């Protein structure tokens, strides 16, 4: 598995990975990811972590190699440098709240200059000998370059999982640099999709549009659940207020949709409280996003 963030059941990517791969033999699964933070799941024990702090060190220290392999079953959990993790989180919070193009390009440049293509990564790949590389499709270009490198080194089959739409470039507006960035992203995603042996989408509409755009077969992959027992849902009639709960990321414009829902609820509640929108996210939203989503008398 190749992911950008650590395999953590509390984030959306990690939760999806656990849903897909729980029940598999942990000895047959490894995860390469691009953060310093520790993983948190019961599925995978073999990891290779490349942090951006490591990349910076590798640029200024000639013999420093970015990235480290570890076995989470045998690793001393106290060896995780909490200070580095906190610094990293502050950095990513900044990028999430200020996702301007120049900052994104600065990160891409860091991955271009950092020495992550090294003997440590090669040894990890040689020791594990993957048959299949499963990777969610990310907006960042460096994750695709990392994928291509792993693919070339291992000759493993690639399965690419498309969730968010990174192919659309027209009609989205934005600055000149934003439009250039979207075109670069779309071209990179298309290249990865064409190199992949199998492409999955998350909806019939995305499957149809991606198949036409890329001229390649797309399949649909949903998260699983146990439907052997029909759940019983009961409405709490002791109170009139109906709560709508959203749990997940507010990035990629989702805060705008939540804002539209909050405004609709605010109108409905004008004469009497009927609905309440509760929003839970692992990420701190920008001030603009928070002002849009959180409305008095609605959310």
Where is each model-derived feature located?
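Membrane-proximal helix-turn-helix segments that form the acceptor-binding/catalytic region
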Residues: 116-123, 145-153, 166, 179-198
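Carbohydrate-associated surface elements
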Residues: 205, 223-224
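Short N-terminal targeting/anchoring amphipathic segment
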Residues: 121-143, 157-159
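A short, active-site helix/loop in glycosyltransferases that binds the activated sugar's phosphate group
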Residues: 35-36, 191-218
């Amino acid at each position: 598995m190749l992911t950008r963030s650590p395999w953590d059941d509390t984030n959306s990517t990690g939760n999806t990975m656990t849903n897909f791969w729980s029940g598999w033999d942990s000895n047959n699964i490894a995860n390469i990811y691009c953060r310093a933070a520790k993983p948190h799941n019961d599925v995978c024990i073999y990891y290779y972590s490349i942090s951006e702090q490591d990349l910076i060190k590798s640029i200024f220290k000639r013999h420093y190699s970015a990235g480290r392999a570890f076995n989470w079953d045998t690793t001393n959990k106290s060896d995780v440098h909490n200070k580095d993790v906190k610094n990293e989180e502050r950095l990513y919070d900044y990028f999430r709240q200020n996702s301007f193009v120049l900052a994104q390009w600065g990160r891409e440049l860091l991955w271009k200059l950092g020495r992550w293509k090294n003997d440590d990564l090669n040894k990890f790949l040689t020791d594990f000998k993957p048959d299949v590389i499963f990777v969610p499709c990310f907006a960042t270009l460096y994750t695709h370059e990392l994928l291509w490198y792993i693919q070339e080194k291992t000759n493993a089959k690639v399965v690419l999982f498309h969730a968010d739409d990174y192919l659309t470039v027209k009609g989205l507006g934005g600055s000149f640099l934003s439009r250039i960035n979207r075109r670069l992203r779309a071209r990179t995603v298309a290249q990865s999709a064409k190199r992949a042996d199998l492409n999955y989408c998350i909806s019939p509409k995305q499957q149809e549009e991606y198949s036409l755009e890329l001229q390649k077969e797309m399949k649909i992959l949903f998260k699983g659940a146990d439907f052997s027992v029909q759940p019983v849902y009961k409405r709490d009639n002791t109170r009139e207020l109906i709560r709508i709960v959203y749990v997940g990321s507010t990035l990629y414009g989702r805060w705008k949709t939540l804002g539209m829902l909050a405004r609709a609820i605010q109108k409905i509640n004008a004469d009497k409280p009927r609905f309440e929108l509760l929003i839970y996210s692992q990420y701190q939203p920008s001030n603009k996003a928070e002002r849009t989503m959180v409305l008095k008398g609605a959310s």
